[in-house]
A protein has these predicted regions:
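Short, conserved beta-strand element in jelly-roll/cupin
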Residues: 1, 5-21, 58-60
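Short acidic-glycine-tyrosine-enriched beta hairpin
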Residues: 12, 20-44
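Hydrophobic pocket/interface hotspot
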Residues: 15, 32, 55
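Double-stranded beta-helix
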Residues: 44, 48-101
C-alpha cells in the first residue's frame, strides 16, 4: 500500500500491467489506463489481484507523506530519491550511473 500523500506538482501515471485500487474512491485502475493528478492532489492506493502492478509514473515537485491529521511526516523529491539511489549503490558496492540532479 502506498501511504496517504500529497503531490506539489503534476503526476502522470500509466498502468503497464496489474491493477491498483485508489483508496479514497475505490476506483480500480488496470493495464493501459492513464491517470492525471493535478498539483495538490492527495491520495493513497494499493496493488490488487495476483498480477504484479507495474506503473510508469512521472512526477514534478515533491511527494509529501501525511499523517492522519494532514501533517507532513516526510517527503520525496529529486534530491532525496537520488540520495537513496546513491546509498543503495554504495551498500551493494556499485558505482552510481546516474548524475546528481
Amino acid at each position: 500500500m502506498i501511504a496517504r500523500h500529497r503531490h506539489t506538482g503534476e503526476v502522470h501515471a500509466l498502468n503497464i500491467s496489474g491493477w491498483r485500487e485508489l483508496i479514497y474512491t475505490n476506483e480500480r485502475v488496470g493495464p493501459g489506463v492513464y491517470v492525471y493528478e493535478p498539483p495538490g492532489n492527495t491520495d493513497s492506493w494499493r496493488a490488487v489481484g495476483d498480477e504484479p502492478c507495474i506503473i510508469h509514473i512521472t512526477t514534478t515537485g515533491r511527494i509529501e507523506y501525511l499523517d492522519a491529521d494532514g501533517n507532513v511526516t516526510h517527503h520525496t523529491d529529486t534530491h532525496t530519491a537520488y540520495a537513496a539511489y546513491r546509498d543503495w549503490c554504495r551498500a551493494h558496492d556499485l558505482q552510481p550511473t546516474l548524475s546528481p540532479p
